[in-house]
Amino acid sequence: MAALLMIIGLGASAQKKKTAAAGGKQFQVYAVGFYNQENLFDTCHDAGKNDYEYLPAKGWNGMKYTSKLKNMSRALADMGTDVLPNVGCAFIGLAEVENANVLKDLTAQPPLKARNMQFCHIEGPDKRGIDCALLYNPALFTVKNVKLVPYVQELAKDSAFKTRGFLTVRGEMAGDDVAVIVCHWPSRFSTSFYRESGARQTKVVKDSLLRENPDMKVFVMGDMNDDPTDKSMHEVLRAKPEISQVGEGDMYNPWYNILAKEGKGTLFYNGSWNLFDQIVMTPNLLNKDAKKKDFSSLKFWKNHVFRRDYLIQQEGQYKGSPLRTKAGGRWLNGYSDHLPVVLYLVKEKL
């Protein structure tokens, strides 16, 4: 496998799906990602939503919205191109998008339109008006079913509070049945209980998909508002840091050691990095036996936090942190307070 990975890593092919050869076999590579859009709002009020901060009366206007779309489409189109130039990701989960109209405007931007990127979205109940969505390239990922599973408050005192649900998309990639659960768990303005509740409910959705089809390759991705080391991820969702630790009912979290050992993250706060943006996967995406690696179906290869200089603040007090759209009431013409994440999959071409 080392030779295969070296060939893939050094190859310069820009085919629809990158193909590499090793030992007389051919392999295809796919990228998937997640990116919190940090308040991708249009300039119009949505009835019943608290979107007033992003209206012209508060200084959010057509010029700023157009710049935001241009910036985000650039970053989204670049995700995955480290390995797959001119191809990018088969699908990308999104958080903090306002509505379907915003997604139409986003996918109409030249970098995404050139790849015919489409989107899945169902309007949710969040009072701020922010939803999850999934961008996808129909040449690489075929969508078969989309549903929004509601976040159910576990405490009676919270029954009136509505927040973001779990966007669940089933489809096919590389001939494999694939499901994606896109999440944006409750913020840290609330206690850890609510993120642990989100993890419990996410696990129920994941387990139901596997009961229906044990061969389904399931990804849970999103802004968890918790790190890989937190209880919600490590204990409740059972997302383990090492492939050798992953058992039945568990998931694999390749981001744990990136934070815990390398100190890298996606969100910079109070002088340190958090890694709230994660993509975890079911065991059937792993090669657990190092001596008998099987690539007849999609398997995990590698992952990274996606960093480009244009995504990073280059000067001032917050030098080195993600370049935001605005901060402290000042428009920065940036991207997001989060960095994107990307992981790569390989499958033998039969």
Per-region residue spans from a language model:
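Beta-strand-turn-beta hairpins that frame and shape the catalytic cleft
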Residues: 24-32, 41, 140-142, 161-184, ...
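A long, amphipathic alpha-helix that forms part
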Residues: 192-214
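N-terminal, active-site-proximal structural segment of metallo-dependent hydrolase catalytic domains
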Residues: 14-110, 114, 120-132, 200, ...
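Active-site-proximal beta-strand/loop segments in catalytic clefts of secreted hydrolases
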Residues: 35-38, 95-98, 121-125, 137-138, ...
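Metal-dependent phosphoester-hydrolase catalytic domains
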Residues: 15-24, 207-218, 226-350
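Bacterial Sec-dependent N-terminal signal peptides
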Residues: 1-19
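Extracytoplasmic/secreted cell-surface and envelope-processing proteins
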Residues: 42, 101-104, 128-131, 189-192, ...
